[in-house]
Amino acid sequence: MGFTTRVKSEASEKKPFNFALFWDKYGTFFILAIIVAIFGSLSPEYFLTTNNITQIFVQSSVTVLIGMGEFFAILVAGIDLSVGAILALSGMVTAKLMLAGVDPFLAAMIGGVLVGGALGAINGCLVNWTGLHPFIITLGTNAIFRGITLVISDANSVYGFSFDFVNFFAASVIGIPVPVIFSLIVALILWFLTTRMRLGRNIYALGGNKNSAFYSGIDVKFHILVVFIISGVCAGLAGVVSTARLGAAEPLAGMGFETYAIASAIIGGTSFFGGKGRIFSVVIGGLIIGTINNGLNILQVQTYYQLVVMGGLIIAAVALDRLISK
């Protein structure tokens, strides 16, 4: 009797509040709510309109896509600094294919995305072959891919391609803009990969400890290659969406977007030291970036200050992750 009573009393005792666990699950939502509340109070007549909120989701779609790709690179304690250049080159190839007569535009889109995947594969192969840190490799390929984009475009914008392509990404389905649906579908696929497939579990294990992953039978080089292919495909998809939204392929598109990609992943709770993160938290991280940019634009704050805010958020997010993990 006494034993039963003791067990019940111990089971009924409340566990102490675990801030680290709470923040890991709900931190990004908390940050987004605070930011929305701040801008909503500063400019309710513009910021809190249905049209503006829809625009935030649409504008965030590109950031969310490259952020999800960056998430995988960071998940294995790496980084991909070439996502902006891959975005530009994939978008340029998509536009060039349509101008060359590739029809329907879906075929040109697939071509652009495949280019993104191929560029990601180059990154992965170079990381595996040289043994250098992905920071060095992708810093170099960022310049190479950007240079190729400038060469094939003669440093000029490319436009005049399929109106159906532009109109497709300007349309909505049951009130939801196509770029938003596009991003959500990709997020669902990547969520399934990371939570329901062995490949995803292996990637997490690789990020946690490469040596342990190797000795447990995980093919480290193969998974690093896959990670960078995923990053490249996501950047390629972002390039397609960006080209459609702009109505032109810009050789300098995506300049500095690696900052947004990293910020989306880190603010979304992905550990910069690898092995921890959730894909839908990265989606919220991308929305946070989009909301901040939108709010600052409404308040007529110069773009330069937006970069200052992004840099500060990255430092704060990494510092908080380090503090919580101790």
Swiss-Prot record:
Is the Cell membrane keyword given for this protein? yes
What GO biological process terms are annotated to this protein in UniProt?
Answer: D-allose transmembrane transport; D-ribose transmembrane transport
Cytoplasmic topological intervals = 1-18, 92-101, 146-149, 194-221, 274-278, 321-326
According to the UniProt entry, its GO molecular function terms are: transmembrane transporter activity
Transmembrane parts of this sequence: 19-39, 71-91, 102-122, 125-145, 150-170, 173-193, 222-242, 253-273, 279-299, 300-320
One GO cellular-component annotation of the UniProt record comes to:
membrane
Keyword field: Cell inner membrane, Cell membrane, Membrane, Sugar transport, Transmembrane, Transmembrane helix, Transport
Concerning InterPro entries, the annotation shows: ABC_transp_permease (IPR001851)
Tell me yes or no: is Nucleus among this UniProt entry's keywords.
no
Tell me the domain of life.
Bacteria
Q: Where in the cell is it found?
A: Cell inner membrane
Query: What Pfam families does the annotation carry?
Result: BPD_transp_2 (PF02653)
Membrane topology of the entry:
Multi-pass membrane protein
User: Which sequence ranges are listed under topological domain Periplasmic?
Assistant: 40-70, 123-124, 171-172, 243-252
Function, as annotated? Part of the binding-protein-dependent transport system AlsBAC for D-allose; probably responsible for the translocation of the substrate across the membrane.
Per the record, the similarity remark reads: Belongs to the binding-protein-dependent transport system permease family. AraH/RbsC subfamily.
What name does UniProt use for this protein?
Answer: D-allose transport system permease protein AlsC
Q: Which organism is it from?
A: Escherichia coli (strain K12)
Gene name for this UniProt entry: alsC
